[in-house]
Amino acid sequence: MSILRIHAREIFDSRGNPTVEVDLYTAKGLFRAAVPSGASTGIYEALELRDNDKTRFMGKGVSQAVEHINKTIAPALVSKKVNVVEQEKIDKLMIEMDGTENKSKFGANAILGVSLAVCKAGAVEKGVPLYRHIADLAGNPEVILPVPAFNVINGGSHAGNKLAMQEFMILPVGASSFREAMRIGAEVYHNLKNVIKEKYGKDATNVGDEGGFAPNILENKEALELLKTAIAKAGYTDQVVIGMDVAASEFYRSGKYDLDFKSPDDPSRYITPDQLADLYKSFVQNYPVVSIEDPFDQDDWGAWQKFTASAGIQVVGDDLTVTNPKRIAKAASEKSCNCLLLKVNQIGSVTESLQACKLAQSNGWGVMVSHRSGETEDTFIADLVVGLCTGQIKTGAPCRSERLAKYNQILRIEEELGSKAKFAGRSFRNPLAK
């Protein structure tokens, strides 16, 4: 079934910034997709086209990206009469029309919006759920429900506190189902709220962009201590482990790292990559930390390689790899990390996201599907993580509707699968291992 009409518009993301939404019509109905947007973005990401017209939305409008869809992409796809199940063909067509390495002509936000809508239409065309259509596109015969990684304490560029490291996450790996993982996550979250309130006062429980708390602490160890306490109070010490997203590129300063980067600059306090690595190792020793994302700057390749070889935990590349096949291939050959963070808007199409995932998995890596800090009510990544069988997803705390929208969709999928539902649990790093 071919595309009858495509219409794009500017809508608002969870931070009040404009983003792209696409309505795609086939004979089967309307299929709608919205594009997310990040705060701490890797410099190697595909280009998110913003208007840069300072008189409108502080320069963050996306009317050009919308216009590229309505005036160029839409007429081309409608006239070509391609069947919506042909995801790769349609994505390729848009990428060729754009003609740039990083999608800077149309904007990755334009191409991705259409790509996501096409994928949703393709599922209905085939008469299968979206996660099953994605599994088919990826060549996966089975599907797996992921362990959620809840970002419950925020720092870095996501928060107004002094904390340098961006995310402290809880992963309920000991749960027996996704529904149970949600319950554990929610209960630990509420216990954490009380722990923070008792220690720092009620105003310390205000939430950040992703629904986590942002108490005004400076020491990263203090965040881990708060998590350890909340997990114990909730009664889940044996079932919950901790993950971190350091986003170290945000505080990289000419070969060193500044763990107090939100204070006035003082080079005397910078630490070396080796000192930072030792700090991480102390975290792993003293807390149930099993996963660290972006521990070093996106170009500090040597530090990544050294750490991954010796840490014995999951080391996740986000700014390092930006869901880009070339960066993933380099990181794989240099053994820089052992897990890919998959963000559809870093690469800008469904097909390339699937390819990035496959490439990472073929190198023996784990893959964690991720939201962005500027999100919408779109739930595509919930179906994506199930269809790709990656076993892990991070899409915020169990708080704020744009985060819960994804988690709730995974709950529905688990219910629909019934007795066939398989939860990744403790095998979240490699759920397909027999």
From Swiss-Prot:
Q: List, alphabetically, the Pfam families matched.
A: Enolase_C, Enolase_N
Q: Where is this cross-link: Glycyl lysine isopeptide (Lys-Gly) (interchain with G-Cter in SUMO2)?
A: 202
Tell me which residues this entry annotates as catalytic.
Answer: 210, 343
Q: In which tissues is it expressed?
A: Testis. Found in the principal piece of sperm tail (at protein level). The alpha/alpha homodimer is expressed in embryo and in most adult tissues. The alpha/beta heterodimer and the beta/beta homodimer are found in striated muscle, and the alpha/gamma heterodimer and the gamma/gamma homodimer in neurons. In striated muscle, expression of ENO1 appears to be independent of fiber type.
In-chain residues carrying the UniProt-annotated modification Phosphotyrosine = 44, 287
Query: How is the cofactor bound, in the record's words?
Result: Binds two Mg(2+) per subunit. Required for catalysis and for stabilizing the dimer.
Catalysed transformations (reactions): (2R)-2-phosphoglycerate = phosphoenolpyruvate + H2O
Q: Which domain of life is it from?
A: Eukaryota
Q: Which GO terms describe its cellular component?
A: cell surface; cytosol; myelin sheath; phosphopyruvate hydratase complex; plasma membrane
Family named by the database record: Belongs to the enolase family.
Which protein is depicted? Alpha-enolase
| Organism expressing this protein natively | Mus musculus
Lineage in the entry?
A: Eukaryota, Metazoa, Chordata, Craniata, Vertebrata
